[in-house]
Amino acid sequence: MAIEVRFHSRGAALAGTLKLPDGAGSSGPVPAVAQGPGWLGLRDARLYEPYHEGLLAAGIAVLVFDYRGFGDSEGDATYLDPMDQVADWRSALTYLESRPEIDSDRLGVFGSGGTGGGNAVMVAGLDERAKAVVSQVPIADGRDWLHRMRRESEWLELLAALREDRLRRVTTGEAAMVSPREGIMVPTPERRTTTVKSDVDGRIPALVQLASAEAIFAYRPVDVVDRISPRALMLIAVENDATTPEDHAYALYRRAGGPKRLVVQTGTTHYAAYAQYRDVVNPLIVEWFRRHLVSGEVHVHEAGAEADIRYLSRPPTQGGD
């Protein structure tokens, strides 16, 4: 059952969809996972549906919502600050606590795609209500993320444009506006051709403040990931990822305590991995949440080898495709 809901976060009314598993509420409250979209994502993206189906089948509710300024949520659509999104996500956890169908002691967070994955880490690092975390293709350091998308000359041009914009905003009140896909990010060739996000691309703000880049510069999930332990963290990366370099996931993994796991998808690319590894990765995500969203007085902690790193690979099909 899916219920369209609204809740408030720092003065903005946010739109969400609460998906409940069969029998939720009739046999007691159920665990729930809150999901905020990835970079330039929306709550109703087709991309997320297989994840939700797996969690619902496991008896776990899902609350997916639009960040402020996106989709059906209120708020300024021109200024993208990941920390505003983190605040929205924490408000989503509070909303889940208000629902009688939900066990407020068994809340998890799931995020995918750049700031989506990074936000999941940031939320859990700041909010102990998140008892289990799955972060897919996350960023660890926003400044490094934007820097590595650019040739050095392009990076220096961005820094110069930001300096000029700061002066203009302070002296005139006017802000430079850019495309979030071209002026904040630099799209890879794969991003220009993929259809993975085609159902939401046309509903994303066309222009945002260039100053959004400065907010991303200040965004460092790696600074809080160590606070998650002893709650459970699973990170998912793509080897040789041209959009979100996998060493960001490695940096988060190294800094985190335990329980923790790093899953690395090989022989694929950032966007292709979603479909190529779906039937492998989705069960791992469901199993992680089932294992670690434990209620009552029983809590499961693990100590073991330093590396719980799993490399996933697909054997070539017949004919070599």
Language-model features, listed with the residues they occupy:
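Alpha/beta-hydrolase
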Residues: 164-224
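Primarily recognizes the serine-hydrolase "nucleophile elbow" in alpha/beta-hydrolase
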Residues: 91-169, 207-208
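Conserved alpha/beta-hydrolase "acid-adjacent" motif
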Residues: 242-248
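Short beta-strand/loop motif that positions the catalytic acidic residue
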Residues: 228, 234-237
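N-terminal cap/lid segment of alpha/beta-hydrolase-fold proteins
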Residues: 1-28
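The serine-hydrolase catalytic nucleophile loop
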Residues: 38-53, 67
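Conserved alpha/beta-hydrolase
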Residues: 56-72
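Catalytic nucleophile-loop/oxyanion-hole region of alpha/beta-hydrolase
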Residues: 43-45, 70-108, 275, 279-281
